From Swiss-Prot:
It is found in: Mitochondrion inner membrane. The keyword RNA-binding does not apply. GO terms for cellular component: mitochondrial inner membrane. The lineage of its organism: Eukaryota, Fungi, Dikarya, Ascomycota, Pezizomycotina. Disulfide bonds join 35-59, 39-55. One of its GO terms (molecular function) is metal ion binding. This is Mitochondrial import inner membrane translocase subunit tim9. The twin CX3C motif contains 4 conserved Cys residues that form 2 disulfide bonds in the mitochondrial intermembrane space. However, during the transit of TIM9 from cytoplasm into mitochondrion, the Cys residues probably coordinate zinc, thereby preventing folding and allowing its transfer across mitochondrial outer membrane. It comes from Emericella nidulans (strain FGSC A4 / ATCC 38163 / CBS 112.46 / NRRL 194 / M139). The keyword GTP-binding does not apply.
Length: 90
């Protein structure tokens, strides 16, 4: 971002923010769909039954822990690549 003027930096920041929001919404949508498909199968009531609610809670927890673990590994790999000078574009 060093070679950009203030307007270009703002535009880049706005684009990055929109991209992050889109990625978040995509991840959220996939989580909802996956947990719904895996856990909800009784459509005789408009509320979740206790078994479904427990399943959804475990599904969300598992997804969040997996995402956190993946993010940690990505950060470790990125740090290792930066330290060894293997980061793309450098």
């Amino acid at each position: 971002m060093d070679g950009l003027n203030a307007a270009e930096q703002r535009e880049l920041a706005n684009r990055m923010e929109r991209k992050q929001m889109k990625e978040f919404m995509t991840m959220y949508s996939k989580l909802v769909q996956r947990c719904f498909d895996d856990c909800v199968n009784d459509f005789t009531t408009k509320s979740l039954i206790s078994r479904e609610e427990g399943c959804v809670m475990r599904c969300v927890d598992k997804f969040m822990k997996g995402s956190q673990r993946l993010n940690e590994r990505f950060q470790e790999q990125n740090a290792a690549m930066m330290q060894s000078g293997q980061l793309p574009g450098r």
